[in-house]
Structures are given as C-alpha cells and as structure tokens.
Regions:
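Domain-edge interaction signal
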Residues: 4-5, 9-146
Length: 146
C-alpha cells in the first residue's frame, strides 16, 4: 500500500486531495484483482460516507483533506513495487487522474461493493468492510461493459 500511495502522491505534485488518493488506490486494487487475480496490496477498503476508504491510508494522510506532497518525504518505491506494479499503477492513475476526488467518489458509490457494505463514518466501523471478492465482482462487471 505504501508504495502505491507514494507513487500516486509523486504524480500529483504539489497537492493531492486525500479523497482522490483513496479513490485512485481503490481503482488500482479493483483493476489489479480482475486483471491479475490477486490484490495489489493486503489492506482492506471500508464503505465510508464518500466512498471506499482504506483506514491505513487514511492514517498515513493524518486525516487531512489535502496533502501537500512537497512536504512529504518521498522514498524509492522500487523495493516495494516491481516494474510491472509501478507501470500498472501509472496506467490506472492516468485513467482516473483527470477526475476530481468528488467525481471519483460519485463513481465508487455506484459500485455494489460500496452499496452492500453499509456505510461507516470512521475507522472503527466494523460493518463497513468491502470484501475483496465484492470489489472483484464489481470490476468484472465494469470490464464486461467496456
């Protein structure tokens, strides 16, 4: 997760909204599940009010709405992500980067994985877990429609 998050932040310099960062990581996870048959990272997403949120990523952002990427200490992600994974993230980022965080939020809240998980409001919402299987199923449906 940290490698994915750092690579996306680096591409969004100088500022990225936490919402946009969360949603792009969600799209990376969903497409990776469908195309490669396994998750990009182990962490789970939860159905929060404005769409999928990975609590661990939320903690990395310190709960801030905006992240000044110039104040973030960047690390070399190559030990965490091989070339294939880095390229995969860059491709998904390229598709979804033109959208705002709110637009991405609207898209993700139309997914069954979000609708069926319940809607939590904070990291302690146990009933809001979006299973990787339900995310996978949503992205299979999306892939079949394109």
């Amino acid at each position: 997760l940290v490698g994915s998050e750092m690579l996306i932040r680096d591409r969004c310099r100088p500022v990225v909204s936490t919402m946009k960062l969360q949603k792009i990581c969600y799209f990376v996870q969903g497409w990776h599940l469908v195309i490669n048959g396994h998750p990009m990272f182990a962490e789970d997403f939860h159905a929060w009010k404005y769409g999928p949120v990975c609590p661990e990523l939320y903690e990395l952002s310190s709960g801030n709405a905006l992240t000044d990427t110039d104040s973030v200490e960047f690390v070399d992600v190559s030990p965490r992500l091989n070339d294939y994974r880095q390229d995969f993230i860059k491709k998904i980022f390229g598709i979804y980067n033109p959208y705002s965080g709110l637009q991405l939020s609207d898209i993700t809240r139309n997914h069954d994985a979000w609708k069926n998980a319940g809607t939590g409001t904070h990291k302690d919402s146990k009933d809001s877990l979006m299973s990787k299987e339900s995310i996978h199923n949503d992205f299979i449906t999306i892939m079949k429609s394109i």
